[in-house]
Amino acid sequence: MSLRHLAVTLVLLGCAGRATGQSGERARPIPPGYGSLTQNDLALRMGNEDLDIRFIPLNPKITPLLARDAFQSLRSLVETHRREIDSVAARGGVSQPGLALVSFFSQRPDVRFDPQTLTLLVRNRVFRPMGVIPLTPRFTSQQLNVREQASALYLFEEEIPVDDSFTISYGSMTSDDWDRKQPILDRERARVSARSRTEPRDTGR
C-alpha cells in the first residue's frame, strides 16, 4: 500500500470512529443525577377554549435528563403504580408498554373529557391507549370545574419513540412539536455526559 493510500485509509477510519462515538453517545444509558431539565421541557401541549392537555413521555431514554427532584418524582410515580402498570401490560400481552403522564386542565366550568380520545401517531400508525391508570379522583369522573386538573398514567402497546418524531391528538387538537425538542435533548445529553465524567452525581444529600 502506498503512503498516499495509507493516509486516506487512516482518515476514513478516524471519521468512522468519530461517527460511531457520536451515535454511541445517544445509545448509551443516561446516568441520573446530572440533568437540569424540567418536566415542562419534556411536555407536549395542546388546547382549546375548554381544555389544556399536557403529555409527558415517561421513557428512560430521556427522564434521566431531568433535574434530580423532577426525575425522582416521576420515577416514584411509576414505581408506586408498578403493579397496576404490569397488570395492564400483561392483559394486553405487552412486555414493555409505552408510558406517559397525561394531565387535563379545565379552562371553564363543567368541562367533560374522554380519556380514550387521546391518541398517539407513530410512523402513520395510530395507537389508542391500551390502559389508563387514574392518579386523581377527578379523572374518574371525567368532568372538571374551572382551573381543575385531572391526571393519569397512559399505557400504549409500544414504547413512545422519543428519538424519533410522533404526534399526539385529542379530537381536532394535535401536537407534533416533539421534533423541535430534539436539539434541547441532544444538548442536555452532551452536558450530562460531560458532567458525569467530571462531577459527583447530585443525590440531594
Q: Which sequence ranges carry the predicted segments?
A:
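Conserved functional micro-motifs across diverse proteins
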Residues: 19-205
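Hydrophobic helical h-region of N-terminal Sec-dependent signal peptides
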Residues: 8-12
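Bacterial N-terminal signal peptides that target proteins for export
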Residues: 1-7
